[in-house]
Amino acid sequence: MLWFRPDFWSRTGRAAAAFFVLAALAGTARGAEQQGAERSIFFDVWREGSLIGSHRLDFSRQGEELRVDIAIELKVDFAYITVFRYQHRNREIWRGGRLLAMQSTTDDDGERARVLLQAKGEELAVDGTKFAGTVPGNLLPTTYWREESMRAARLVSSQDGRIFEVTVTPLGEEDVLSEGRLVKARHYSMRGDLDLDLWYDAAGEWVRLTFKASDGSLIEYRRVTPPAVMAGGEGQ
């Protein structure tokens, strides 16, 4: 059977923990955060050429705050039988480039996880299934939509609150298919507690992700034009 997850999907013994530097990053934090209008980013998730689900991020403004709603839906079938399901719901609140709060729930093939992050002064309070405590307030969650994550040495799990130690290596520009067109994208390799590759376009927007599942199969995120309505609703 196949078990995988790019950080949100990281579990000891079942996953190749996956699910994110240069002056070029200085202006890329604007990416999705500073696009302004309500908008969405949508990925089809593929395993070895088979579509197994989706990952969607919806961005909206409320005054000075940016809200990011995230939904992941995955299902793996074998001989018409579902052998794996994964559902993740997450809401982030940002202001001025700082994470104020994040709350997520996950059903990882029947195993439940949750995490609540809240800004407390210069720190971030973490209350998760696998970790509870305080961390520096500039620590980013493993939701990957900010290219700024590629400067991080530590990330906090958006699934269960664990702290991941990572090393990120920039690998240069490549052509990547994003929403039906080829774009130049910066490629990064993330290794350590997480093991995956990510790509960001000239505006700093996340456009691709790949990693190997524990069975050796290739999992790939392909960015596509978003459907009008999030499947399954917000789930918050």
PLM feature segments, named:
Residues G31-G121, D127-K130, V135-Q236:
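Acidic, serine/threonine-rich low-complexity disordered tracts
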Residues A15-A26:
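Bacterial N-terminal signal peptides
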Residues L2-A17:
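Bacterial N-terminal signal peptides that target proteins for export
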